[in-house]
Every structure is written in structure tokens, then in C-alpha cells.
Amino acid sequence: MTATDELTQNAGRYELSHLRALEAEAIHIIREVAAEFERPVLLFSGGKDSIVMLHLAIKAFRPGRLPFPVMHVDTGHNFEEVLAARDELVAESGVRLVVAKVQDDIDAGRVVETIPSRNPMQTFTLLRAIRENKFDAAFGGARRDEEKARAKERVFSFRDEFGQWDPKNQRPELWNLYNGRHRKGEHIRAFPLSNWTEFDIWSYIGAEKIKLPSIYYAHQRKVFERDGMLLAVHKHLQPRKDEPIIEKSVRFRTVGDVTCTGCVESTAATVSEVIAETAISRLTERGATRADDRISEAGMEDRKREGYF
């Protein structure tokens, strides 16, 4: 059979792989938001999900420039590797970066630092930045497989004038039809990666050869154990007297505030090795490594109701 015969036989039977189908869905959502809203912004933490989302957004408008900025809500308690990767990616891609700093709100007396973790304070800073920049839509990298509150959130998630989310009052989403209707002061959070899994994310990173911060791969690091979780020794996070420091080969499955982000023991130093580890994991990355989700059974939902990512 010639190549022409094969093409003729397969004409009309074009099939997308599941990764390309997810990519097409995400690009459709990104373009829909860009067409429907006046001032969208892409929330960018420097983690794997937001890096994949930025990659998709750039691809959605190529060869043109990204028609909206990216915004990092900076707690001031960051992994240095993540900030370096953020700055490098922004410089390479030529996107406009907006940085909203929690420290600015602490200095101005708008929020009070009562606990070591600044993770809860991000909500105030995020909502202030959305309000000051008059953003009417914000892309988030949340996925439904991460956590049960995120599992029930719509792709277009409506937020009222206070930035709050009501999980009992969500709009229906049929097929690929999304309702972005909102009044002045309200906004929409859009989640292009809603239907992706951690395995999908890593498979796409491998397929597209996307560069990530080095802490996503196995490396030697000084850690200590707290509440069954390995935490990194850092200037913003020190062990207690009864928490001995040990050095292990670890990697991070998710990236957030240093004070509440744990790591896992691992020897996976390449994308293919991480994919193999992910395939046999029985815990989501947030369930395994995020102390902020262990506050209560409804910890994430309570924060999202207040305006969290």
C-alpha cells in the first residue's frame, strides 16, 4: 500500500490522542475567555500547572503576542528555584508580569501575620490585585483530580463583588458552552486544566519538552518530618527541637508557600521517571504534600469560598 492509498483509506478517520484532545479543549477555553472578557489575567505561581497553562496560552495565540498579562501572588516565602524559573520563563516568552506581594499588605496593615504560613493571606492580596487592575477574568491552573472542592467547581467559576465563590450556586455547563455573564465588580475564574490529571500534566510536559523548576525532580535536600510530611529546611521554615534534620533524595509534586509545601522521597530525576512514579501513586499531590489542605476536611472549600485560587 502506497502512502497515498493509506491517506485515502484514513481520510475522514482523524483521531486525536487524549493529550491533544485535552490541549484542544484548554486552548478553546483560553480563546473563549480572551474573546469574551475585557481584562483577563493568567495567575502564575511558577509551578508545573501554571507553566503548562502559560505554554497553552502562548500556543493559543501564536504567532501573535499573549493578549493578557500573567500575575504572581508572591507570599515572600518562595523556593528560590521557582522564582528563578519564573523570571527566566517570563524573559524568554516576553509576557508582561504583574507581581502582587503579600508583604505590601502586611506593611500597610491591611493583613496581620498571625501564623508562620502566609498561604491564607494570599486571598486578600489576590482580590486586591484583581480589583486594582480591574481584571474581570482570571485563569487558574486548578485541576479536578487534585482535591474534592476543586472537583465540583465549574470551568467558568463565578465570583461575586467580594470575590467569593458559592458552590451551591454554580452555573450549568453543557458540552463546551460557558456562561461568562457578570456585572461590574464581579469576575470569573477560568480553569482550562479542569479535566487534566497529574499524569496528563507530566505526559504533556514530556511531549512538549516543557522546562520546569529543578525542585520537581529528585535532588538531595535537608528535610524534617512533621505530621507525617517531609518539609524542607528553609530560612522561613525551621524544625522544632524534637524534629531532627535528615538529608534525603526528594522531589516536590506541587509548589506553594515554603511553610506548607511538603516533598516526597524519590529518585525520579527525569520526566519519564516522574511519569512512572505518578502512574503508581495512590495519593493526589495536594493530599500527599500540602499542609494547608489538612486544616480541616473542608479546608480548601472554605478558602475558595473566601476568594482563594
UniProtKB/Swiss-Prot annotation:
Keyword terms, alphabetized: ATP-binding, Nucleotide-binding, Nucleotidyltransferase, Transferase
Pfam families with a match to the protein in the record: PAPS_reduct (PF01507)
EC number: 2.7.7.4
GO molecular function: ATP binding; sulfate adenylyltransferase (ATP) activity
TM region(s), chain numbering: none
Protein name per UniProt: Sulfate adenylyltransferase subunit 2
Assembly mode: Heterodimer composed of CysD, the smaller subunit, and CysN.
Protein family according to the UniProt entry: Belongs to the PAPS reductase family. CysD subfamily.
Gene3D superfamilies: HUPs (3.40.50.620)
Top EC class, one word: transferase
